[in-house]
């Protein structure tokens, strides 16, 4: 009931119900954070100006925006106006108070949203080490999955996914380089949309990769994701890759029709499944719903040279990480003493008990050794990864099979939080292609495995967000409601699982 009421409150504000005010909605959201956050550790800090923002919205009721009075949480690698630092989860940035809004945050405010606070994340958006624990940062500690508190929320937008799933807010903003919106959305049983690269500005976001970075909504449902996307999409002169955004931005809500699946052809990425029989079983149920709603499904069993994408992508990410982070840190406030990636590496070494007790920084060290954006090896890797994932990947599969979208399981169900071995993930899911190609990727909850959510991915060509949201909405409506989180300590707390693990009766 709590989750349903939270959603209805935001919907009432959007539709103009006189009984609600932005201040009342914000106070209710603050109360939910204070009550629920101690269990999942998703929210780093509440913005002390949140109630003032809400009161200002109430004074403007005659000119309310489409997100009027909606409290929204922001991942803590995205800058916001006010006193909160933007830390990327690192103690090296604990004093990074820029007192400015990223353009996407300004868009949320202009649409009437209340910036409620900042969410925890995988430190440095999970680009420090291959042995990391998703959802952990030195600033925020470990975020947990509200469906089982010993399970990982994925990352790097861990707090955003966990907070929405827990019912603290209806929407949060995440960022993604490869899986960092869609994975935490899927594992926490909520909707996540990674937009086309260039639809949403990256200005004033702590960077990893100019080729793959973007921000996007994590939301309670597809409708809320569409509303939020409409507020954050748009061109930004400071981010040239967004030059075409205004031309492609559209009314995303208009695409949300219950019959959107009728008569469409959708490709089924069989090569993205097969690593988990329980997930495959849920995936087959989801495919059955798509068929029942009138979609024609086309089997796609392989993608040539898919195994070559990862190595090329790694060269791109390492090279662009050094270039992008050095540029960001060079303009950080004087209170930030780390001005280069090399400085951050030295800081982590000097503060190893706080920063590196659980895992190291070998990816940072690899990035520091790269030779810059003019390096022929980098240029070749970027061209190769874009071709294999884009032109010869997503685009080729869409064209060759005459389909409008591709579907697959997003990720495995959540793994255990493991302070000994780091993340232990059983499969890679469907999303890597869209991340590398720079094309949109929507994940919608499709069911659960032993009570742990799994997501269904919808992917399409560049600028096809409206189409994907429409397909996802039609699927969501046909699928029906799914269980809300119960904040159980472990999957083993469920009687059916406990019975399976108990010794046989003699």
Would you name each region that the model predicts?
Residues 20-178, 196, 288, 390, ...:
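Gly/Ser-rich catalytic/binding loops embedded in alpha/beta enzyme cores
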Residues 69-88, 255, 260-269, 319-388, ...:
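Short helix-loop capping/hinge segments that flank enzyme active sites or metal/cofactor-binding pockets
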Residues 166, 194-286, 293, 304-307, ...:
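A short helix-breaking turn/cap at a secondary-structure junction
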Residues 1-53, 82, 285-295, 346, ...:
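An N-terminal boundary/leader segment
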Residues 42-44, 71-74, 107, 114-118, ...:
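Structural recognition of the beta-strand scaffold that forms the well-ordered cores
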Residues 29, 69, 110, 279, ...:
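Glycine-rich, small-residue loops and helix-cap segments
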Residues 102, 251-252, 275-302, 324-336, ...:
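Acyltransferase
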Residues 137, 181, 188-204, 443:
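Flexible glycine/proline-rich, aromatic-decorated loop/lid segments
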